[in-house]
Amino acid sequence: MKLFRLTAAIVLSFALFPSHTLAEYAEDRPRIGLALSGGGARGGAHIGVLKVIEELGVPIDYIAGTSMGAIIGGLYAAGYSADEIEGILAETDWRRALSDQPARRDRTMRKKEQEAQFLIPYRVGFNKGRIQLPLGVIEGQHLDQLFHRMLFPVVEIRDFDQLPIPFRAVATDLVTGEEVILSGGSLPDALRASMSVPGAFSPVRIDDRLLVDGGMSNNLPVSVARDMGADIVIAVDISSAMLTEEQLTSVLSVTEQLTNFLVRRTTDAQLASLGDQDLLIVPELGNFSAADFSEAIKIIPNGYEAASAQGEALEALASGGRSTPRQQVVNDSSDYLVQFIDIVNGSRLHDEIIRSRLAVNSGEKLDLAALEQSVDQIYSLDVFTSVTYDLVENEEGESGLRVNAVPRSWGPNYLQFGLELSSDFSGSSDFKLGAAYTRNALNALGGELRVVGSIGREDELSFDFYQPIDSQARWFVEPQFYFRRENYNYWEDDVNIAELEIDGWGVKFGVGRNLNSRNRLRLDYEFARADADVITGDLGFPLDDEIEIGELVMQYLHDSLDSLWFPGSGTFHRWGYLYASESLGASGDYEQIDGNGSLVWSRARDNFLLNYELGYSFDDAAPIERWYRMGGFGRLSGLVPNQLSGQQAMLTTLAYY
């Protein structure tokens, strides 16, 4: 099914009916409006109702919707059929749509490396000495993109009365609590605003107003349909029932009940306004959750059944099935010529950083798939709360593309925390508590300061400054300064004979080339000084108590894994060559070559992950602090961490999940 392109034909009934007869019928019959209530994922029932309306030929002159009712109603008003909307609902990846994490393939190599530092990706803003949180758990970037893709055929229509069916979306002003009726502007933005449940989704700013879910002010917009000109209103109520006392079992259920109070109050007020000429359809939805969008398609038959039960009343409105013609919009992205590009950028980043990532050029036809990929890459810069696009026209009548990049209200300073615990249940355990401070968009080219600290198994404090030196971040420099204390146990014949502590500081300076989002080359120089002490035991060989490091490291990194922890596709390879000499500041001369990687094979729901590690020290000349170490979870799990050490290493593991 083609979800994102409406057919090029205009559906006309003139072949069946003389034009004067059709016109007279359209003028004489009462105007019918459709009011679709909010109800989250329960909105799948609206599709079932639309199927019956189509089958019976009921003419719909106006549509007003709230929240999920606005989404279903907006798609129908834009020209999609009930079957096409069902296809969209079935094929949408709701897990991705309701997530703000960019696809890993679109993230920069730097962001991929940072991901490995903290298992949990969540963070908080930190500005002027205060913690700041986002205005919603979900900021909605992927929802925005989903709506723009679905409604691309009508994205140029700014007056909702000009849609195939005139349409209104209902939202609520977060500041005043007033009902806001959206009758024009960006249709994707209107739908996004109407369904922004406070707290769950960030509000949407339209015309200098912060808008949230319309259910707070008018969950069943009967009055809106009436004001549009409807003589008869078909109202479909899918709102959730109030929770019983037995169902109020936690703070979450109490919060849900408070929301139900507001929604139920506005719904009841609209129900009271229905007259004898109007029709109310209330699908029986039982315990279907308003939050589980993956189950929404299963609710369609409930809506169909409820509408069919009122088939006689609907047939009377159909007047023999002579519905007015529906015009389906003609709009193919490949026919749209981009004559200019506008960048609306509220961040410190230079506009060229955004423009250089657009796979769209002035004077070319628009490629929607390429544009969406570009939007993903801009969003993955981790600076913006949303990146959207509009088709616009300038004063000269030229057609163009406008990219809207809205910076995060709770950035660009972020704090992130992590805790690592491990135990072999035989007396050996470790912990590591870490925190990171990140300052994004320090300058027009996207410089970034990152401070990472940890205590526990390894104490470390590092200051890292990453500076791209061109708008596409192809070249970069990265100076770093760090303090570090590490403890190593030295084993011999499965006996821990000594504990070694290395305490020191170091500086690194790197220059690199990002070949693309999957491949990178870099060269680093590291200079470090540290003290080494044997805390307990005896190594059995002399140890230099002063460590001097002066090294050049050349590295190639490839990372196309779709997930760091449980990948289903892609590969990972890191290979490096290390050269140290007295002339560089080291205590001696030594060379190493090493690498590690992962390869994934997937078949249906079965995944196989092959990991490898290789390390080789030329002439066995590497000092003890540069020995390879193995042992611990996933790296010979039967051994304690770093139980094996030496000048050479090789390990291969195979995992199934």
Where are these regions (language model features)?
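Bacterial N-terminal signal peptides
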Residues: 7-17
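Short, well-ordered secondary-structure micro-motifs
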Residues: 179-182, 245-247, 292, 533-534, ...
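Short beta-strands and strand-coil junctions in structured, solvent-facing domains, enriched
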Residues: 241-243, 349, 363, 410, ...
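Gram-negative/organellar outer-membrane beta-barrel architecture
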Residues: 369-374, 386-561, 628-634, 642-650
